[in-house]
From Swiss-Prot:
Produces ATP from ADP in the presence of a proton gradient across the membrane. The alpha chain is a regulatory subunit. GO terms for cellular component: plasma membrane; proton-transporting ATP synthase complex. Its EC number is 7.1.2.2. It is a peripheral membrane protein. Keywords: ATP synthesis, ATP-binding, Cell membrane, CF(1), Hydrogen ion transport, Ion transport, Membrane, Nucleotide-binding, Translocase, Transport. HAMAP family: ATP_synth_alpha_bact. The keyword Ion transport applies. This is ATP synthase subunit alpha. GO terms for molecular function: ADP binding; ATP binding; proton-transporting ATP synthase activity, rotational mechanism. The lineage of its organism: Bacteria, Bacillati, Actinomycetota, Actinomycetes, Frankiales. It comes from Frankia alni (strain DSM 45986 / CECT 9034 / ACN14a).
Length: 552
């Protein structure tokens, strides 16, 4: 039996080889905390003293949480996901990452959750990078004035409360007054710009659904898909059954996706539907985290909640690429009270508001825009010259009409001027009515409003105004296409175009038939008389003899 001998040199070489092959990169420091209290989508965690504000924490099972309250000894965390399996005593680990979402063109045509994860069953999304949710808005020197129009396709808005690229225009009104429809029509109206392939015209859209029913979100997606608008739109969905944390971060996730395009020199549009539900979710989170309540139980920083979100909408300077992000926040009022806390906050932040009134909606005026309380602080700077020239008197005429309409309800006798004003106002209201999901191109809007403000439809019965408008616009497109081309080409309404418009509407009136079967123009123009057919007669004139002085 041979004896086993161990040489010290072999042991030394083996140890040296092992030490040389050891990789120390896998070693690191990991902070581990524990759940102290959990419930209602909130967890209080202790043992993570180096956690940052808005840092993501990882619970057992891979559920993420957002650190909002950094207190002495514990952290108040909002759970982003299913909280049923989180129990007291479970381990919680730091991720060292601030909340961010993936961004890029791969999100166009997709439906994602507030963390950027696809929920439409169409597979993974190839992202171009990530963008933090909490980023500083563009500074004053990084912006430029809003001066490029963003057409909504809605006559009442483009004429009276114009929206420009980089503007923040609030859509406010009671429930079921058409707020979402206005926003969806604006997205659909960008379809022709997208089809043009011109990056300076294309507008990429983001629709953020906050606290809505899943069936409603599905309906919006179907509407966009049927209209061919989903190809350039991203839907960020935080339905009503999602935790409050998702509803809180959804608008920031949508704006991060849109800001990626803005900072790349492109144009984007984002719709927040609606911020009232985000404020309610933030109120619930703040109360559960035991933050001091203020007016209507909202926390003291609820103004900052919306201001830091909406200030991200901007028209960037040319040095930064000239990109833009236009925001359409939606706020729901109760009993048309626009003086409530959240509505007044958002009104003071935005560049104007479109107020939709339930009374007008119930009267069949759709979109139900209240002209008196709707305003755009950008105004004519975001309008083409053609639209500005025809829409100048529209707001004044409608405001006077509403005032006279209320006065005439008392049964008072009115003079002819007042009756004429009422008649024209009723026809203007009919002209501004518009079917759902059928935005008008800008050239058709200009011709329609020109016909109304110049009194060309004053002789058309109110019941026939909308049919007259539709058929006349089609007639111009067939027989006077040069009018549309001139409006689109120069952006102006020159004297030659107005002259051709007068000829076109006069010719169309001669062939238009009212709903009762009678022609609009009752008598055809009389043909000139043939001189040979005129019979000349001489009439004898008998003069009395002159009187003499003797006869006097």
């Amino acid at each position: 039996m041979t004896e086993l001998s161990i040489r010290p040199e072999e042991i030394r070489d083996a140890l040296r080889e092992y030490v040389d092959s050891f990789q120390a990169t896998s070693a690191g420091r990991e902070e581990v905390g524990r759940v102290v209290v959990t419930g209602d989508g909130i967890a209080r965690v202790e043992g993570l003293p180096h956690t940052m504000t808005n840092e993501l924490l990882e619970f057992s099972g891979g559920v993420l949480g957002l650190a909002l309250n950094l207190e002495i000894g514990e952290i108040g965390t909002v759970i982003l996901g299913e909280a049923e399996h989180i129990e007291e005593g479970q381990e919680v680990r730091r991720t060292g990452e601030i909340l961010a979402v993936p961004v890029g063109d791969g999100f166009l045509g997709r439906v994602v959750d507030p963390l950027g994860r696809p929920i439409d069953g169409l597979g993974e999304i190839q992202a171009e990078g990530t963008r933090a949710l909490e980023l500083q808005a563009p500074t004053v020197v990084q912006r430029q004035p809003v001066k490029e129009p963003l057409q909504t396709g809605i006559k009442a808005i483009d004429a009276m409360t114009a929206i420009g690229r980089g503007q923040r225009q609030l859509i406010i009104g009671d429930r079921q007054t058409g707020k979402t429809t206005v926003a969806i029509d604006t997205i659909i109206n960008q379809r022709d710009n997208w089809a043009s392939g011109d990056p300076s015209k294309q507008v990429k859209c983001v629709y953020v659904a906050i606290g809505q029913k899943k069936s409603t979100i599905r309906e919006v997606v179907n509407t966009l898909e049927e209209a061919g608008a989903l190809a350039y739109t991203t839907v960020v969905a935080a339905p009503a059954d999602e935790p409050a944390g998702f509803k809180y971060i959804a608008p920031y996730a949508g704006s991060a996706i849109a800001q990626h395009w803005m900072y790349n020199g492109q144009h984007a549009l984002i719709v927040f539907d609606d911020l009232s539900k985000q404020a309610e979710a933030y109120r619930a989170i703040s109360l559960l985290l035991r933050r001091p309540p203020g007016r209507e139980a909202y926390p003291g920083d609820v103004f900052y909640l919306h201001s830091r979100l909406l200030e991200r909408c901007a028209k960037l300077s040319d040095e930064l690429g000239g990109g833009s992000l236009t925001g359409l926040p939606i706020i729901e009022t109760k009993a048309s009270d626009i003086s409530a806390y959240i509505p007044t906050n958002v009104i003071s932040i935005t560049d104007g508001q479109i107020f939709l009134e339930s009374d007008l909606f119930n009267q069949g005026v759709r979109p139900a825009i209240n002209v008196g309380t709707s305003v755009s602080r950008v105004g004519g700077s975001a309008q083409t010259k053609a639209m500005k020239s025809v829409a100048g008197r529209l707001r004044l005429d409608l405001a006077q009409y509403r005032e006279l309409e209320a006065f005439s309800a008392f049964g008072s006798d009115l003079d002819k001027a007042s009756r004429d004003q009422l008649a024209r106002g009723a026809r203007l209201v009919e002209l501004l009515k518009q079917p759902q999901n059928q935005p008008y191109p800008i050239e058709r809007q200009v011709v329609s409003i020109w016909a109304g403000t110049t009194g060309k439809v004053d002789d058309v019965p109110v019941a026939d105004v909308r049919r007259f408008e539709s058929e006349f616009l089609d007639y111009v497109g067939r027989s006077h296409r040069g009018i549309y081309d001139a409006i689109l080409g120069s952006g102006k309404l020159g004297d030659d175009v107005i002259q051709e418009l007068n000829s076109a509407i006069a010719a169309f009136k001669n062939q238009f038939t009212l709903s009762d079967g009678k022609p609009l123009v009752n008598e055809a123009a009389a043909s000139p008389l043939d001189p040979s057919a005129v019979r000349k007669e001489s009439i004898p004139v008998h003069r009395a003899p002159a009187r003499t002085d003797d006869e006097g």
